[in-house]
Regions:
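Patatin-like phospholipase
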Residues: 1-188
Length: 188
């Protein structure tokens, strides 16, 4: 499935340095709070459009933060993002949450904007329930947060639509305040 999605994206591939890729990267970079990788651990997942294999970018990858985010969000209807000789598509094709990357942590809080849904085959082990079960089997406490109805209504069907940001932020803030007590218990 990831290879098929990559092949579809490659059909729309823009030439290296084309104005489309340059503009998309500039848009992503402008939305970031910083152009530098944070010192704390941040893992950003993308999928190699040629092989379908996932790649995890971090501050040690030798890739600019803006490129990692642009690659990780090159979703349906967008060409893959080029980094060097490679082309990458949305890391959500691997898993919308990628919770398994938190293996080894005592507590794992998963924010699942798609409510745990995925199109990946069950035997891939990329469904959120399977990832959470594996984390628990390794000793992690896992808490999952799914959007409530107000949050789902606020972000609508296109998660990348910038016009939904303000209402989504308000709805998420309200949901977070409602869950604050539960999450305080989880962290202590």
């Amino acid at each position: 499935m990831r290879r098929r999605m990559g092949a579809a994206a490659l059909e729309m591939d823009a030439a290296p340095g084309s104005s489309g890729q340059t503009q998309r990267r500039a848009t992503v970079a402008a939305r970031l709070p910083s152009q530098h990788w944070p010192q704390r651990s941040l893992l950003i997942v993308a999928v190699d459009a040629h092989t379908g294999e996932p790649i995890v970018f971090d501050r040690h990858s030798g890739v600019d933060l803006a490129d990692a985010v642009t690659a990780s969000t090159a979703g349906p209807g967008a060409p893959p993002h080029r980094i060097g000789d490679n082309r990458y598509i949305d890391g959500g094709y691997r898993s919308p949450e990628n919770a398994d990357l938190a293996a080894g942590y005592k507590r794992v809080l998963v924010l699942s904007p798609l409510g745990g849904r995925t199109r990946a085959p069950l035997d891939w082990g990329m469904h959120l329930a399977a990832q959470a079960d594996e984390l628990r089997a390794r000793g992690s406490r896992v808490e999952t947060i799914f959007p409530d109805s107000n949050s789902r209504d606020a972000f609508g069907v296109n998660l990348m639509d910038p016009s939904t940001r303000p209402p989504s932020a308000r709805a998420g803030y309200d949901q977070g305040r409602a869950l604050a007590g539960q999450l305080t218990e989880f962290w202590h």
